[in-house]
């Protein structure tokens, strides 16, 4: 077990280094698109949390694999783990994820099909993610089985 954890930590460190480069390039890409410094900062902060907290939470997953993890992030993990989870923050993260994976597509790191699937999933699932958040935050719901729509 200690060897497995040491390997996980080593893999995570390598991914964090790659993520730092990606985030710097993403920041430059957003700036070139004409976004304000504040907006660029918000998008980069959102992606830092997604890449370096969520994707590395249980396994060492590189940024490219995150395109397949948006539903579990916005529909469950973010609601559970982020104290600041709100309707507006879920929408903000969704916008950031679309921008980041558009950037990743332009860099040739994900396919057009994967990008299209991500955008479709966000559009289709957003109402359910927001409803899940509302149930999670409802003080009258005491049984967590009533929160998550499995």
Residue ranges of predicted features:
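Charge-rich, intrinsically disordered N-terminal extensions
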Residues: 1-110, 116-150
């Amino acid at each position: 077990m200690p060897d497995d954890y040491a390997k996980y930590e080593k893999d995570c460190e390598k991914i964090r280094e790659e993520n730092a480069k990606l985030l710097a390039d993403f920041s430059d890409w957003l700036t070139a698109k004409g976004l304000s410094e504040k907006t660029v900062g918000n998008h980069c902060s959102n992606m830092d949390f997604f890449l370096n907290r969520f994707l590395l939470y249980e396994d060492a997953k590189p940024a490219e694999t995150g395109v397949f993890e948006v539903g579990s992030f916005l529909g469950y993990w973010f609601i559970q783990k982020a104290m600041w989870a709100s309707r507006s923050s879920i929408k903000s993260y969704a916008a950031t994820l679309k921008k980041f994976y558009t950037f990743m597509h332009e860099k040739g790191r994900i396919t057009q099909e994967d990008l299209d699937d991500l955008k479709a999933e966000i559009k289709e699932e957003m109402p359910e993610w927001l409803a899940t958040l509302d149930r999670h935050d409802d003080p009258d719901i005491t049984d967590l089985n009533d929160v998550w729509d499995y």
